[in-house]
Amino acid sequence: MRTVDPALLRPTVRTMPWRAVGAAGTLGLLLAAAPGLMGEGVDGRLALNVLRASAVAFALGAAFLLDDPARHTTAAVPTRRAVRHGLRLLCLAPVAAAWWTAALLLVPEAVRPPAADVTVEAATVLALALSGAALAVHRGDGARPGQAVAGFLLAPAVLGPLLAPGSWALFTTPDDTRWAAAHDRWAVLLCAAVAVGAVCAAEPVRRIGRGRLRSPSGTSGPSRA
């Protein structure tokens, strides 16, 4: 089984959009800390909405994960796109896990929503951001798709709770009888987002003329050498 050279991690870490992730993560933690600073007047609904807003904030920063000013240079290297994406995701995953744990712990336990269920929501929002970035890279030539992806993510995050049909029941509260069904839907969305991201991590094959395929490295057809 082929393994990834650990030497690839160092340049990946250097080119990660840590400023965007750090700024978004800081904003998310400030939001998560709000219920604890408000005293006894906080209820579970407010705490849940704050955690949802925190998850969206972090996802907006993660939308910049695949921004790479050198994309047009690295597209021709032997390392496949799936590996390059995977390395960036590998760098982000422990940061995201630690950040979300801190966000949950900042919310007072008395009003904290069920951790497992709200984590599914947060993971789905993050997966949507990452799959959106992967789709933008797969379908476009831009080196910095993060800003556009973040904009597309922010719009449904704000309008979704207001415009979503009641039958979808995504944005429910723990005391709602539809809470379990809602998180079944969140899980389906999560799986769909992961599937889209996996498909978009594949190298595109561009068709040139009739019946000729060109690979990202610039070769077409079998070698005549």
Regions found by a protein language model. Name each.
Residues 1-47, 134-139, 159-225:
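Hydrophobic alpha-helical transmembrane segments
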Residues 114, 150, 154-155, 215, ...:
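Intrinsically disordered, low-complexity, compositionally biased regions/tails
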Residues 41-61, 87-150:
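Secretory targeting signals
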Residues 10-24, 50-56, 81-85, 154-155:
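Alpha-helical transmembrane segments of integral membrane proteins, especially early/N-terminal helices
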Residues 60-69, 159-167:
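Juxtamembrane membrane-interface segments at transmembrane alpha-helix termini
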Residues 37-38, 67, 71-73, 103-108, ...:
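Transmembrane helix-loop junctions in multi-pass membrane proteins
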Residues 64-91:
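Helix-loop-helix units of permease transmembrane domains in multi-pass membrane transporters
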Residues 27, 145-159:
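Central hydrophobic cores of alpha-helical transmembrane segments
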